[in-house]
Amino acid sequence: MLLAVATRERAACLGRHVGAILVADQRIIATGYNGTPTGFPNCDEGGCHRCANPESYAEGRGYDVCICVHAEQNALLQAAKIGYSVQGSHCYSTLRPCFGCLKELYQAGVTAIRYLNEWAPSDPIEAQAYDALLGELAGRGVVVAPLELPEGLLDLR
């Protein structure tokens, strides 16, 4: 998780900074942080309309038009670019993954997802769908749970 925390520092998003790593056989196979696609201007350079115009979007809205690639997505894509299978791997993220990232992690074969900070949909209907997805994943043996940090470790949240 410490590497995911360090990785999130690369994010240039005007909102949250999120980092994620994929681990297989106790080896880090990919890292990712949230940000614009390769070659696009970063959020802090005006690359994302949603980040540049937050007043235009209600809280929790507009993510479908956000240009940014989520940290978990970037980690999956980096593993694919270099030819690493993520089947059976674990994901460590600084934020509880969104609905889309949970689906993608499952589809890619990730079997455990640990996160540092809580996140949940603010819309009640979306929250129901999210909880249903968590139930489906649990029924398929996929662990989605917060990571308990050892006592005395610097607060990294």
Predicted regions mapped to residue ranges:
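Zinc-dependent deaminase catalytic domain
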Residues: 1-157
